Design a protein with these regions (language model features):
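The canonical Cys-X-X-Cys-His
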Residues: 42, 47-55, 111, 115, ...
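Surface-exposed interaction/gating patches
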Residues: 122, 126-168
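Bacterial N-terminal signal peptides that target proteins for export
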Residues: 2-12
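Disulfide-stabilized extracellular ectodomain repeats and their linkers
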Residues: 46-49, 65, 73, 144, ...
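N-terminal signal peptide c-region/cleavage motif recognized by signal peptidases
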Residues: 20-21
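Electrostatic cytochrome c docking/interface patches
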Residues: 24-46, 59-64, 116-142, 216, ...
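Axial heme c-ligation environment in periplasmic c-type cytochrome domains
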Residues: 60-67, 82-118, 123-129, 160-165, ...
């Protein structure tokens, strides 16, 4: 009886620890989203981010840095908190998201709100296969089958559920992230991890090619590629 009691207690302790760790991961984003953003402070905090992501938050065509302009507030916040806590392995970002560098929860709230107001690059990096090609059509079919239920029919994502906006993201960046996830160098949600047992590398290339060609609403775009963030002139 004592052995059974000890085993039950041990199992309950494990369940409590697992639940607590999951709650701890979710709770900060709920707390931070309660703050009222200060866009002026967000602009100042963004100076740290602009060193890599550029003042326009457009990132790089080669996929080194993503376009973060126009991304959902909840998505940006989740990514920053995941990197800060170590849930997401990103050594290049790790030093810049710590409290000693960018500040506390209020500062995070401010900077993600500021980023979300920036217009997107009207000429982001796209994949090699144009609409009408066999690869494009294959990518569209796979996207509808595996991705659209979370990321939306047009790649618009979902702010409330923290599903990233994919439309407008650089093709080379998405390919790099897919390879990191495939090689288990980036932690991803189980529903995403299951795709790597279903889809081939060629499938992923075609899906991401299709995503990179999804149109971004004109209202979310900068007027042209010559646009420069007026806050950084």
């Amino acid at each position: 009886m004592n052995r059974i009691h000890i085993t039950l207690c041990h199992s309950l302790c494990i369940l409590v620890l697992v639940f607590s760790s999951k709650l701890a991961a979710v709770e900060p984003i709920r707390v931070v989203l309660e703050f009222t953003p200060d866009l002026d402070n967000g602009r100042r905090s963004f100076e740290i981010c602009a060193r890599c992501h550029l003042p326009e938050a457009w990132g790089n065509d080669d996929g080194t840095y993503p376009q973060i302009a126009g991304q959902h507030v909840n998505v940006l916040m989740k990514q920053l908190l995941d990197i800060r806590s170590g849930r997401r392995n990103n050594p290049s970002m790790q030093p810049f998201v710590q409290e000693r560098t960018i500040g506390g929860y209020q500062d995070l709230s401010d900077v993600v709100a500021y980023i979300s107001t920036l217009p997107m690059n009207p000429a982001h990096n796209r994949g090699p296969w144009p609409e009408g090609s066999a690869e494009y059509e294959s990518g569209e079919r796979l996207y509808r089958q595996h991705c659209s239920s979370c990321h939306g029919q047009s790649g618009e994502g979902n702010n409330e559920l923290s599903y990233p906006r994919l439309q407008g993201q650089h093709y080379n960046y998405m390919k790099r992230q897919a390879r990191l996830a495939r090689d288990r160098l980036r932690r991803i949600e189980p529903v995403m991890a299951s795709l790597f047992t279903t889809l081939t590398e060629q499938d992923f290339d075609q899906v991401l090619n299709y995503v990179s060609h999804l149109p971004v609403p004109v209202s979310d775009l900068a007027p042209d590629t010559a646009w420069r963030n007026p806050d950084f002139k």
